[in-house]
Amino acid sequence: MAAKIIDGKTIAQQVRSEVAEKVKARVAAGKRAPGLAVVLVGSNPASQIYVGSKRKACEEVGFVSRSYDLPETTSEAELLELIDTLNADKTIDGILVQLPLPAGIDNVKVLERIAPDKDVDGFHPYNVGRLCQRAPRLRPCTPRGIVTLLERYNIDTYGLNAVVIGASNIVGRPMSMELLLAGCTTTVTHRFTKNLRHHVENADLLIVAVGKPGFIPGEWIKEGAIVVDVGINRLESGKVVGDVVYEDAAERASYITPVPGGVGPMTVATLIQNTLQACEEYHDVEEA
């Protein structure tokens, strides 16, 4: 069986076009365009690339994009003060602080300082808690993006055995909550999991997010499984690969996401969706 490719690039472009249409309609109706503030501390090259793509996506859909590039020497107090200012700014619907932050700045304190209704990354404990309670508001971008991919390909998730490999706060944990909402019987594996192969072989839906190239061999994949590879790993040769051995897995799976061009584009597209949602559902009321 040759797997159908889940084309994240195309779906992400659809999502962005849908948002752009809604923004155009808002502006035509005399409402303001949504605003996103992107905060970068220091000059981590990978972070600069991510931030650049987020800002570009914002401008393409007609958002107001505000950039705050702070030096490596920025103190935690200065960063928190900026967040307070942005929380109070009625033209800003979303605040994104690019991680990782430099040493000496407490990630948790910073993320918790962002107002939950401006937390477009979906990392605030309030938003994670709402997801756990089956009443989500702003949802973490990568997991929500994966759910969107499955929905757009009309993949029925109810009753599937879903296995999430990796238990990070950014992907694995919120992904498990999204899968429960989507009707899956969900298992989360992590570095202490025994007999990982057994779990993978029983997965109807496999989500892999560990950041290790070729971590899951293709022969472990159950015949007909749906494989979502969140990993983005650059080899010494410069080639970008996922956490799953793609060629072998694609022979056994029914659907598979490629790397690059699978999950990655959806993360930014979902950030854009979240910002529009924050604007329309939580901030328009204040202007009425």
From Swiss-Prot:
List the InterPro entries: Aminoacid_DH-like_N_sf, NAD(P)-bd_dom_sf, THF_DH/CycHdrlase, THF_DH/CycHdrlase_cat_dom, THF_DH/CycHdrlase_CS, THF_DH/CycHdrlase_NAD-bd_dom
Query: What start-end ranges are recorded for coiled-coil regions in this protein?
Result: none
Recorded catalytic activity of this chain's protein: (6R)-5,10-methylene-5,6,7,8-tetrahydrofolate + NADP(+) = (6R)-5,10-methenyltetrahydrofolate + NADPH; (6R)-5,10-methenyltetrahydrofolate + H2O = (6R)-10-formyltetrahydrofolate + H(+)
Keyword Nucleotide-binding attached: no
Positions that bind NADP(+): G166, A167, S168, I232
Instruction: Kindly tell me the pathway this chain contributes to.
Output: One-carbon metabolism; tetrahydrofolate interconversion
Q: What is its EC number?
A: 1.5.1.5, 3.5.4.9
Under PROSITE patterns, the record lists:
THF_DHG_CYH_1 (PS00766), THF_DHG_CYH_2 (PS00767)
Q: Which UniProt keywords apply?
A: Amino-acid biosynthesis, Histidine biosynthesis, Hydrolase, Methionine biosynthesis, Multifunctional enzyme, NADP, One-carbon metabolism, Oxidoreductase, Purine biosynthesis
UniProt record, GO biological process: L-histidine biosynthetic process; methionine biosynthetic process; purine nucleotide biosynthetic process; tetrahydrofolate interconversion
* One Gene Ontology cellular component: cytosol
Show the GO MF annotations: methenyltetrahydrofolate cyclohydrolase activity; methylenetetrahydrofolate dehydrogenase (NADP+) activity
What residue intervals traverse the membrane? none
Instruction: Give the multimer and partner information.
Output: Homodimer.
Q: Its biological function?
A: Catalyzes the oxidation of 5,10-methylenetetrahydrofolate to 5,10-methenyltetrahydrofolate and then the hydrolysis of 5,10-methenyltetrahydrofolate to 10-formyltetrahydrofolate.
Similarity comment: family membership = Belongs to the tetrahydrofolate dehydrogenase/cyclohydrolase family.
Q: What is this protein called?
A: Bifunctional protein FolD
What species is this protein from? Klebsiella pneumoniae subsp. pneumoniae (strain ATCC 700721 / MGH 78578)
Q: Lineage, please?
A: Bacteria, Pseudomonadati, Pseudomonadota, Gammaproteobacteria, Enterobacterales
Gene behind the chain = folD
